[in-house]
Regions:
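Auxiliary Fe-S-binding modules of radical SAM enzymes
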Residues: 2-28, 165, 178-244
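SEC14/CRAL-TRIO lipid-binding/transfer domains and related phosphoinositide-recognition modules
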Residues: 13-19, 38, 51-52, 65
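Canonical Radical SAM [4Fe-4S] cluster-binding loop centered on the CxxxCxxC motif
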Residues: 28-61
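A secondary-structure boundary/capping signal
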Residues: 35, 83-84, 111
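Conserved phosphate-binding and hydrolysis motifs of nucleotide-dependent enzymes
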Residues: 43, 84-85
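Conserved alpha-helical substructure of the radical SAM core
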Residues: 49-80
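Residues that line or immediately flank small-molecule/substrate-binding pockets and catalytic motifs
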Residues: 50, 84, 135, 203, ...
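Conserved AdoMet/S-adenosylmethionine-binding subsite of the radical SAM
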Residues: 67-79, 88-221
Length: 244
């Protein structure tokens, strides 16, 4: 893994992959998406399962190579999406983001909201232009949905508050998975993020590399629409990802 010398110490962000072009991940911008390695959650439906636990060193993305790529894309790409895994697990994420910003790119940060203090610190740097937080389920269903018995949902509530009050454009989103979600859950989820700028419901897609995919599937289209309509009771601008 490439190490960069900064402020008298070495910094390292573990990268697992790069999507060189996306027109979808960063709303309104032409961007690339970089994937960090490691996650504290074990959501059975995670479509990036290889990034959650470990990735073979020879398959990792070299940080130096990533920044060389960005320099070649200056004036072509508008932004960089940082996703995972869970990016806020990376100790040196603030420095990593600052280096991206120094090249003139806008930065979108994806997070599961597990580390509110880290999120607050990163957002306060002013280097993040857009943040997207996954709301996994209702608070009561969080432990089962993230694969961690006794998961502390107060951290999720704190992160929601921090993001809403940050002054930075943001969105909340939920991947709808059967049987973990039912349409009626989405009104309760919407109450959790009431007053938010935007809420997206995403249909589950089996990537073939799930953590534990047995018995999981998509919500039927009509059930997905009912979930959207339930959420719209609280957040009128709720959309299913991809719909007009």
């Amino acid at each position: 893994m490439h190490l960069t010398k900064q402020r008298g110490r070495q910094t390292e962000v573990k990268l697992g992959g790069l999507q060189k072009l996306t027109l979808l991940d960063y709303p309104g911008l032409v961007a690339c998406t970089v994937f960090t390695v490691g996650c504290n959650m074990r959501c059975p439906f995670c479509h990036n399962a290889l990034l959650v636990s470990k990735i073979e060193e020879e398959n990792a993305l070299d940080e130096g190579g990533f920044f060389a790529f960005l320099k070649k894309r200056q004036g072509i790409l508008d932004g960089v999406c940082i996703t995972g895994g869970e990016p806020t697990l990376q100790q040196d994420l603030p420095e990593f983001i600052a280096k991206i910003k120094a090249l003139g790119f806008k930065v979108k940060l994806d997070t599961n909201g597990s580390f509110p203090d880290r999120i607050k610190s990163i957002l306060e740097t002013g280097n993040v232009d857009y943040v997207a937080m996954d709301i996994k389920n209702t608070l009561a269903k969080y432990p089962e949905t993230v694969g961690i018995p006794g998961f502390d949902t107060s951290k999720i509530e704190r992160s929601i508050k921090i993001i809403k009050e940050s002054g930075i454009p943001y969105e909340f989103r939920t991947t709808a998975v059967s049987p973990l979600h039912e349409a009626d859950d989405f009104e309760e989820i919407a109450k959790l993020i009431e007053g938010s700028q935007g809420y997206f419901i995403q249909g589950f897609k089996d990537s073939g590399e799930l953590i534990r995919g047995e018995g999981l599937g998509e919500l039927p289209e009509e059930e997905l629409k009912r979930a959207r309509d339930k959420a719209r009771i609280i957040i009128p601008q709720t959309k299913i990802r991809g719909e007009d």
